[in-house]
Regions:
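Small-residue-rich alpha-helical segments with characteristic i,i+4
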Residues: 84, 199, 205-219
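Transmembrane helix boundary and interhelical junction motifs in multipass membrane proteins
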Residues: 57-65, 191-200
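N-terminal transmembrane alpha-helices
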Residues: 36, 51-56, 85
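Juxtamembrane transmembrane-helix termini in multi-pass membrane transport proteins
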Residues: 62-107
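Residue positions within transmembrane alpha-helices of multi-pass solute transporters
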Residues: 60-61, 93, 120, 227, ...
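Transmembrane helix-bundle signature of multi-pass membrane transporters/permeases
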Residues: 81-89, 115, 215-226, 282
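Juxtamembrane transmembrane-helix boundary motif
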Residues: 1-50, 71, 77, 98-185, ...
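Hydrophobic transmembrane alpha-helices of secondary-active solute transporters
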Residues: 50, 54, 184-189, 221, ...
Length: 301
């Protein structure tokens, strides 16, 4: 009986988390691992919220990490982007394992269409586009993505208020999803997030898809996009510096718990509560960006 309970798929997220903890302790030792979290407490605290958001919504952990690091902690956007992709490779992987093991519904056909183009987009972006993108432009692109996401949530709320039911089953057009996934992948290479937002927006706006099902779908796509982007950063571009490595060691123990928890909790809560929470986060981020852009706009006009 105990063996059957342990080998159930619902236990696999726990095994993944325990495996990550065991590896970190083996590599660093318990006291050093704990000390790393304390020394980078601001990053660990940021990712406590970021991982919860990543696991349970269509916003990756980078949607919290990127603005906090660039606007509050004054960390270079290039560093924040590399960190966002890397940390999502752990947190969103844990969330994806939870989604599949707990059989949280997804649009499987959409995942199969979107994954190859999102992978191509993030690869092209990291290798050829990101090195040429100005710092303020990168921040603005991220805020624009979040604004699109907010409008998508508002549209979804309006439809529900007017008793327009969501679609459990959709018939996606392949070309449309491939183009949107490519654009989302490019955005992910610039700011560490984007494939999930673009895909979620398309599902909700064009197909009136179920929000929770669309959310789980976008999390799966962003997981693989992050893994591909992080692999390029680590082994081809060599952009995982000692500074970023320190941030990761502090954040990984947090996100492998927070992301699965977010995936589980957000599959249970009312959609209205989830939407309100996300709109507050987006409003704060866009307000910070407008504040930063204001001096530049004054110079232009």
């Amino acid at each position: 009986m105990m063996l059957q309970r342990i080998t159930k798929p619902t236990m696999w997220p726990l095994f993944f988390t325990l495996g990550v903890y065991a590896t970190l302790i083996w590599l660093q030792g318990f006291s050093q691992a704990l000390g790393q979290i304390i020394s980078e407490f601001h990053i660990a605290l940021t990712m406590a919220l970021g991982s919860f958001v990543a696991g349970g919504t269509a916003l990756g952990g980078g949607a919290v990490a990127f603005p906090v690091m660039t606007k509050l902690l004054d960390i270079d956007p290039a560093i924040a982007k590399v960190f966002s992709l890397a940390i999502q490779s752990f947190g969103m992987t844990a969330a994806t394992i939870t989604i599949f093991c707990r059989r949280i519904p997804v649009y499987k056909n959409v995942i199969l269409m979107a994954l190859p183009m999102a992978a191509l987009g993030v690869t092209l972006s990291l290798l050829y586009i990101a090195p040429l993108a100005p710092r303020l432009l990168v921040k603005s692109i991220f805020s624009f993505l979040l604004l699109c996401f907010a409008l998508t949530l508002i549209l979804r709320w309006w439809r529900k208020a007017h008793h327009q039911p969501s679609s459990e089953f959709i018939q996606p057009k392949m070309l449309r999803f491939m183009v949107v996934a490519l654009i989302g992948g490019i955005a992910s290479g610039l700011v560490g997030s984007g494939a999930d937002i673009a895909l979620f927006a398309l599902l909700v706006i064009a197909y009136n898809a179920d929000v929770k099902k669309a959310t789980a779908t976008s999390v799966v796509v962003m997981t693989f996009t992050s893994l591909i982007g992080s692999s390029i950063n680590a082994w081809h571009l060599n952009t995982i510096t000692s500074e970023i490595n320190g941030y990761l060691l502090a954040a990984i123990p947090i996100v492998v718990v927070g992301a699965p928890l977010g995936a589980y909790v957000c599959s249970k809560v009312k959609v209205g509560h989830l939407v309100s929470f996300l709109l507050v986060l987006i409003g704060l981020e866009v307000s910070f960006t407008c504040y930063e852009l204001y001096p530049s706009l004054l110079e232009l006009f």
